[in-house]
Amino acid sequence: MAGLSHPSVFGRATHAVVRAPPESLCRHALRRSQGEEVDFARAERQHQLYVGVLGSKLGLQVVQLPADESLPDCVFVEDVAVVCEETALITRPGAPSRRKEVDMMKEALEKLQLNIVEMKDENATLDGGDVLFTGREFFVGLSKRTNQRGAEILADTFKDYAVSTVPVADSLHLKSFCSMAGPNLIAIGSSESAQKALKIMQQMSDHRYDKLTVPDDMAANCIYLNIPSKGHVLLHRTPEEYPESAKVYEKLKDHLLIPVSNSEMEKVDGLLTCCSVFINKKTDS
């Protein structure tokens, strides 16, 4: 089944939904390994700059949801909704402690008048961080947070697009080591597991994608947007955080490159795509 999205439309967005980080993020957010403690003041500052890029710099209408101290991971809004065109799938996150995060997101997306589909099957789990939409098709990572039933419900929700599953063993999510860096361009990390996942995606797809290989898996998570007044825009990790990967992004001469710091969220496994959900609302003409 061929996807219907046209490359000139891929990456278009009018709105972004974000959520402020709670202080409980520092001690109680889920993390794969215990490492450095999160500097909350710095995390807040980095998040505010991130939101500022989306709103002030790129002109998106930013819907800012408030922090909830009882939901330490609530800043990572990507995991609780998958939006494609006019439809929003409200997910069932793999971690039980995150299930209540969906309520406020559902309310926000209803206000934006999207068609809401809720994942109510108690056997299904899906984190948005495991969902890579290429503009032509979906790849869904099967991880500790996302299962086959979750992928099936996503396929039922977005019937116009092919959906393929990719095993994710060594990372939290599929997008912990890849993302879209352009209409036909997959950014991918250099680790063995990242390269193995890419090979599976290439085998599953009828389409041939270009690839942008970066040395650091975490830095392969970037945000591509197609902003009419700006052209191709790419938010990527800073040279201070990932110098070698930043050099690779700097070779993209037809993109407006915006380095964004994310050191604090990364301590609790949060990457750039994790902190926003993008919506492209059609204007009434």
Swiss-Prot record:
Residues that bear Phosphoserine: 33
The EC number(s) this enzyme carries: 3.5.3.18
Catalytic residues (positions): 173 (proton donor), 274 (nucleophile)
Residues that hold substrate according to the record: 30, 73, 78-79, 98, 145, 268
Activity regulation info: Inhibited by zinc ions.
Tissue expression from the record: Detected in red blood cells (at protein level). Widely distributed, high amounts found in kidney, brain, aorta and pancreas.
Keyword list, A-Z: Acetylation, Hydrolase, Metal-binding, Phosphoprotein, S-nitrosylation, Zinc
Taxonomy, superkingdom: Eukaryota
A GO molecular-function descriptor: dimethylargininase activity
Residue(s) carrying S-nitrosocysteine: 222, 274
Chain positions recorded as Zn(2+) binding sites: 274
Top enzyme category: hydrolase
Pfam hit, one: DDAH_eukar
Reaction(s) the record says it catalyses: N(omega),N(omega)-dimethyl-L-arginine + H2O = dimethylamine + L-citrulline; N(omega)-methyl-L-arginine + H2O = L-citrulline + methylamine
Gene3D superfamilies from the UniProt entry: L-arginine/glycine Amidinotransferase, Chain A
A Gene Ontology biological process term: negative regulation of cellular response to hypoxia
Residue positions, PTM N-acetylalanine: 2
Function (record text): Hydrolyzes N(G),N(G)-dimethyl-L-arginine (ADMA) and N(G)-monomethyl-L-arginine (MMA) which act as inhibitors of NOS. Has therefore a role in the regulation of nitric oxide generation.
Complex and partners: Monomer.
Family: Belongs to the DDAH family.
Name of the protein described by the UniProt record: N(G),N(G)-dimethylarginine dimethylaminohydrolase 1
